[in-house]
């Protein structure tokens, strides 16, 4: 034996010791190796502001399980880790900290702020990386990247410049999503929607001479000062005579035209819609079609500007109250209705987002989306589960241009340089900062804005491998293999990686997207600070161990679906760890320092053939499950095989032989135990890396590390289907006899004769398994026969797959006393049935009791009736 196992398993000691060894030995490191197939996963980079939560724990457990599986299958595996600069989140955090010190970022300036931000990143940015190590993540930490490191910045700048030169990046004054709190633009994907109870205000717009009027319904009366038209459907006969005429904006007094546009739904409200091009994306498009003026009335911080007079200086909500009151006085407010609608909020601060026009940088997405759609349609990129194709297509088919500029300082600064000569006005977009304007020679200054975080994250699969340089890693590992991610960032991240991969590299970024859901609490609620139901993975690891947490996450998760997490599942996983550990100690104690040879196939008995056949079958099934990303199914199969078939059955079958006198049989049993335990540890390793390494290293002939050991393969050498089926039949008999003994209160130490009535063709199996029947069923003798002749009167029986098993009771228990006891139980159960039936038959109880109480009473009645039937059957058996 290479090492002796202590009496109890100390996960803290094992995990810290093994992880340090793994990293020191370079087991996680990957190199371009033409002799092996590459397999690469890029880690979804967690924000540097974050700390490990259950979502990270699930995401990285799944990735690590896949990587460890592929590594054991001979692939050159690269799991490339890194962190995201998280532009808005990080800047908000640093600004908040500075505010506590009484410092405003604008007072210290950009350079000083960025210096502070980099210091903050150095101090806190590695926290989550340390926590990922605690999970057992086998990342190649030598290749760890950061979305704002020098290499990523070069890639981001080059992509921006190249797309700009192709006309796919442009600057324009367009409608965007604006967060007045974060003070920055947001992309469509960064806006979340919440249903809010509000109102629908019906407002009358009068003709200049009051000769006609038109009524519009709006959810945002505060935007009325920015109205530039009223739109009606061209097919709406009610307004045919009014198209081309004008009305007056209430309170403001400005004349605006009535235009015809198919965007308007005749059936909604009055069929007339006020058009505010600067504050609604649909209105903006109507404004473009009809060449309407643009009047922006909101400031960046959510107040009314001078064009919003007479409400200048008010917040949007203050303006809403004021203009509604003014329209009531003027008679323009027709009615107010209660109305629930979706309101956009910032995905970071959750404050209301304002649609408004602003001069920003955009990516033209429709031309880029075509190839990104094709590669999924044609199966080059597969989503697992496949239903997420629909989610992806819904986004891509309706994609709009992406606003990529952010009014922040922390991030990749836009590589655009503006000539300061007002007569020139040239904009130079270039990789290298120009010293002067290339057109007129005047001074230039760089754009103040930074790029959307997801712009740089979209290049993660190739920027991390060295692009734009042609590195050996890029050549070998790109396209990467599998992306593991939550369904909540398919729009944010997955779609954009496919867009950038197909455009920049001319190749897909990965061939499979394995999608998982979110981790919810035991009640199915999303974990949140407000609910106080968050669970700290590090606390779970401290109490139960990383393996227990990992196993509970893998077995509780199915692809694409949310999962419920509870400590009970972790406790069950810890119990499994203890079961595996104790079984391994048993094997180790019985092997000692012996040299263990190969299995002698000529000396296998029926139990040996059964366990080797089952090991072989499980290895094949688990391999198929892993290849199909059915990780939860694979983990559960390994669990069930180890717990039930190996520990509960084969080890118990092996014990008499280990202590027997046949030396060659003892040696063969030991060889089988070592083989089955070793292969079981390999099958379990992707999910529980620490305990499997520890136990594997306790076995003779163990390789340097289990993570580089060969994955168990299905082999014809261990195909014993016939013997395995026969052994399963014998085990069914043993289970039935155990159940009979328990039902009849036969003391465990009392041995009994067993009569087995079975067809003649089954007799050899019972002869081969006679020793196991006698030990595991508590039998003193096993009589196998084809009929019921000679079976003692009063014997109890159980029907099994291979026939019928009988055990006589007369010498095992005092039958008269047992009859007396059973009769007492029957009377008690009859009383319980009568009580429950009386209660449920009482109209007063049924009318007044809560449904839950009634259902509980019905359940009690069902249980009592079932127990009564069993007791009466037992009494009949006892009475013969």
Model-flagged regions — what are they?
Residues 210, 214-216, 221-275, 279-285:
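Protease-associated
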Residues 68-76, 97-110, 130, 134-139, ...:
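Secondary-structure transition/capping motifs at alpha-helix termini
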Residues 33-94, 147, 156, 216-219, ...:
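N-terminal catalytic cores of NTP/NDP-binding nucleotidyl/phosphoryl-transfer enzymes
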Residues 51, 214-232, 348, 354, ...:
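Conserved phosphate/anionic-ligand binding catalytic regions in large, soluble enzymes, centered on
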């Amino acid at each position: 034996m290479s090492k002796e196992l202590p009496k109890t398993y100390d996960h803290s000691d094992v995990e810290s010791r093994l992880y340090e060894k793994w990293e020191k030995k370079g087991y996680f490191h990957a190199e371009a190796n033409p002799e092996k197939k590459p397999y690469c996963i890029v880690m979804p980079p967690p924000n540097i502001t974050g700390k490990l939560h259950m979502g990270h724990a699930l995401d990285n457990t799944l990735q690590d399980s896949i990587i460890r599986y592929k590594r054991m299958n001979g692939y050159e595996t690269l799991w490339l880790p890194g962190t995201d600069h998280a532009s808005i989140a990080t800047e908000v955090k640093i600004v908040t900290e500075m505010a506590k010190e009484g410092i405003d970022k604008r007072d210290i300036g950009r350079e000083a702020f960025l210096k502070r931000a980099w210091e903050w990143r150095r101090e806190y940015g590695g926290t989550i990386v340390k926590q990922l190590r605690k999970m057992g993540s086998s990342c190649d930490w030598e290749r760890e990247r950061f979305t704002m490191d020098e290499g990523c910045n070069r890639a981001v700048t080059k992509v921006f410049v190249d797309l700009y030169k192709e006309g796919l990046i442009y600057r324009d004054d367009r409608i965007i999503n604006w967060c007045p709190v974060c003070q920055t633009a947001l992309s469509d994907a960064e806006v979340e929607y919440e249903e809010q109870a509000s109102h629908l205000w019906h407002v009358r717009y009068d003709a200049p001479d009051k000769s006609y009027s038109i009524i519009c319904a709006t959810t945002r009366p505060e935007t009325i000062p920015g109205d530039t038209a009223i739109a009606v459907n061209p097919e709406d006969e009610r307004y045919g005579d009014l198209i081309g005429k004008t009305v007056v904006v209430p309170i403001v007094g400005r004349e605006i035209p009535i235009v015809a546009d198919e965007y308007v739904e005749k059936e909604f409200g009055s069929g007339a819609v006020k058009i505010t091009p600067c504050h609604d994306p649909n209105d903006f498009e109507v404004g473009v079609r009809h060449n309407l003026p643009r009047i922006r009335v909101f400031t960046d911080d959510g107040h009314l500007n001078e064009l919003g007079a007479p409400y200048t200086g008010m917040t949007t909500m203050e303006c809403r109250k004021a203009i509604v009151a003014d329209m009531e006085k003027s008679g323009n407010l027709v009615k107010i209705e209660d109305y629930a609608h979706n309101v956009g909020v910032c995905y970071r601060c959750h404050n209301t987002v304002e649609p408004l026009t602003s001069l920003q940088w955009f990516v033209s997405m429709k031309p880029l989306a075509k190839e990104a759609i094709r590669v999924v349609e044609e199966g080059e990129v597969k989503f697992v589960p496949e239903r997420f194709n629909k989610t992806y297509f819904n986004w891509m088919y309706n994609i709009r241009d992406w606003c990529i500029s952010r009014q922040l300082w922390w991030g990749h600064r836009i590589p655009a340089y503006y000539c300061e000569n007002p007569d020139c006005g040239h904009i130079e977009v270039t990789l290298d900062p120009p010293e002067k304007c290339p057109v007129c020679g005047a001074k230039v200054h760089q754009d103040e804005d930074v790029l959307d975080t997801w712009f740089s994250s979209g290049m993660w699969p190739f920027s991390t491998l060295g692009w734009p340089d042609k590195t050996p890693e890029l050549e070998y590992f790109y396209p990467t293999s599998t992306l593991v991610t939550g369904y909540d960032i398919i729009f944010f991240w997955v779609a954009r990686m496919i867009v950038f991969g197909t455009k920049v590299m001319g190749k897909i970024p990965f061939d499979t997207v394995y999608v998982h859901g979110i981790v919810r609490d035991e009640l199915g609620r999303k974990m949140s600070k407000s609910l106080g139901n968050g669970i700290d993975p590090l606390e779970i690891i401290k109490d139960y161990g990383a393996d227990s947490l990992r196993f509970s996450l893998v077995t509780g998760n199915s692809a694409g679906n949310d999962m419920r997490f509870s400590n009970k599942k972790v406790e069950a996983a810890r119990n499994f760890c203890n079961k595996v550990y104790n079984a391994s100690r048993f094997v180790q104690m019985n092997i000692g320092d012996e040299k263990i040879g190969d299995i002698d196939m000529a000396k296998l008995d029926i139990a040996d053939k059964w366990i080797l056949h089952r090991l072989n079958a499980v290895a094949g099934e688990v391999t198929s499950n892993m290849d199909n990303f059915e990780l939860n199914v694979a983990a559960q199969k390994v669990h069930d095989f180890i717990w039930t078939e190996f520990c509960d059955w084969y080890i118990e079958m092996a014990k008499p032989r280990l202590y027997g006198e046949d030396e060659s049989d003892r040696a063969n049993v030991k060889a089988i135990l070592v083989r089955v335990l070793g292969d079981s540890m390999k099958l379990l390793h992707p999910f529980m890396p620490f305990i499997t390494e520890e136990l594997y290293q306790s076995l003779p002939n163990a390789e340097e590390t289990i993570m580089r050991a060969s994955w168990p393969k299905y082999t014809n050498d261990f195909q014993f289907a016939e013997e395995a089926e026969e052994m399963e039949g014998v085990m069914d008999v043993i289970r039935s006899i155990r159940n009979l003994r328990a039902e009849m209160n036969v003391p465990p130490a009392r041995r009994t004769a067993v009569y087995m009535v079975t067809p003649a063709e089954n007799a050899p199996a019972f002869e081969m398994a006679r020793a196991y029947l006698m030990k595991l069923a508590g039998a003193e003798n096993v009589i196998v026969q084809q009929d019921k002749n000679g079976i003692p009167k009063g014997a109890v029986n159980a029907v099994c797959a291979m026939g019928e098993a009988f055990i006589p009771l007369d010498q095992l228990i005092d039958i008269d006393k047992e009859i007396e006891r059973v009769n007492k139980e029957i009377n008690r159960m009859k009383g319980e049935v009568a009580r429950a039936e009386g209660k449920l038959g009482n109209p007063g109880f049924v009318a007044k009791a809560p449904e839950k109480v009634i259902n509980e009473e019905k359940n009690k009645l069902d249980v009592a009736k079932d127990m009564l039937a069993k007791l009466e059957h037992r009494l009949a058996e006892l009475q013969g």
